[in-house]
């Protein structure tokens, strides 16, 4: 037989388990590349698997090809997809495979006694006789088949059932197909799964259920939980509680026990850092099961049915809510008053002056009626810039409404005396930032210097201008005193002239007040109001600042509900 055709039979790589204890290096099993210029110059041959003859015509092909070298050389090129192997390496590989088979049979004497019934119809002695009768090439092919069957028996007896347990079984058909060239040989392909219950094919999911037989007992283990569980509120982080300040008991000190409503919402617009004066800075937690002593000092929101401070209760549901704009950061006395007006839940004594900020001059715990030994240390009051504005959309307090007052109805004129000059400047600034064109003499001194009388009469004769009277002890003295006492006080004379013009208009209107608004400034009392103005609403600054804005906006503080249909009467015959 030509050596080229024998090399064609011997050059395929077959996965065979080799005994590592044998003194044969593994490098001998690797094919040594031998390049031929004739083979590289020719185009690649088609796949020999679709053209290979069956096992019956194999000997005939061998005898025919032995006589013609050119025909054998063409068959070599068709069947050889890999590089040629030398004859010496092929013989060494055959010897290694035979020695490995003998070593395997010595270690496993029970496995080599007989072939399975599905693989061959002959027994062990018969197979040895067949091997002896075949030529050298067929003996090597038969030994390859037997080694493949031994490897399949070893993989079937292996206890490993993991993901890689089926790879050896699946590789056997591929190796057999490569060695046979896609055709049936003298010895049939072994069936390694005859003694196994079923195929352990891996599933698509490689998780906990990917092993059908569950050898390691993975299915009996508990599945791991997520790192953070949102199903259990007790696992959420708790708020920080200060240890420096003692907690107050609501049963013992009712004034301090301002509890939150039962349905606490972390997204409520009032859920900001509004605190009682002098109280520690407690953050409102979002846990529902946290002890309620943690938020005893948080101001609760204004609920429907609670009247606004400083307003006369004329109804049950206040709807008109004024959101104030503060003019400048140096206004230190108006911003604490905003907290008093915006949040009715803030406790305050009845006899506390309306213009005095809470706890500004006294101890921080006086308005809370707490014992002195339980009061916290005196903290610094929050700066005016740090006090946040009230929420623009408080819940359950009506709908927001933007006033559409025209520009000609936003003009305001203020008459005052010199003892309230500084407070009047703050009041004018407050009206300006809230959209009103406010005029006083010190802001229009250049225009006023042209003609003082005409400047005053321009606002007095215009019926659309609202006139605010700043009541003070000096104002009562200026308007009711003798003119001889005002000879040296030019401002007092102008105040007396304006008062007389207003009184004449009031009489002409039938003693009805349409545009005069008396406002009590600090250190003023009700008896300082002129007699003809006492039969009207008298406001206080800065206590009733929202009511003053509502009066200038021509809006009511309380709005009646819409009228419904008449009730249905049921007539019952006698």
Swiss-Prot record:
Which InterPro entries does UniProt cross-reference here?
E3_ubiq_ligase_TRAF3IP2, SEFIR_dom
Q: Per the UniProt record, which EC number(s) apply here?
A: 2.3.2.27
Q: According to its UniProt record, in which tissues is this protein expressed?
A: Widely expressed.
Q: Note the superkingdom of the native organism.
A: Eukaryota
Effect the entry attributes to changing residue 19 to N: Likely risk factor for PSORS13; there is a reducing binding of this variant to TRAF6
Q: What does this protein do?
A: E3 ubiquitin ligase that catalyzes 'Lys-63'-linked polyubiquitination of target protein, enhancing protein-protein interaction and cell signaling. Transfers ubiquitin from E2 ubiquitin-conjugating enzyme UBE2V1-UBE2N to substrate protein. Essential adapter molecule in IL17A-mediated signaling. Upon IL17A stimulation, interacts with IL17RA and IL17RC receptor chains through SEFIR domains and catalyzes 'Lys-63'-linked polyubiquitination of TRAF6, leading to TRAF6-mediated activation of NF-kappa-B and MAPkinase pathways.
Q: What is this protein called?
A: E3 ubiquitin ligase TRAF3IP2
What's the source species for this entry? Homo sapiens
Q: Species lineage, top-down?
A: Eukaryota, Metazoa, Chordata, Craniata, Vertebrata
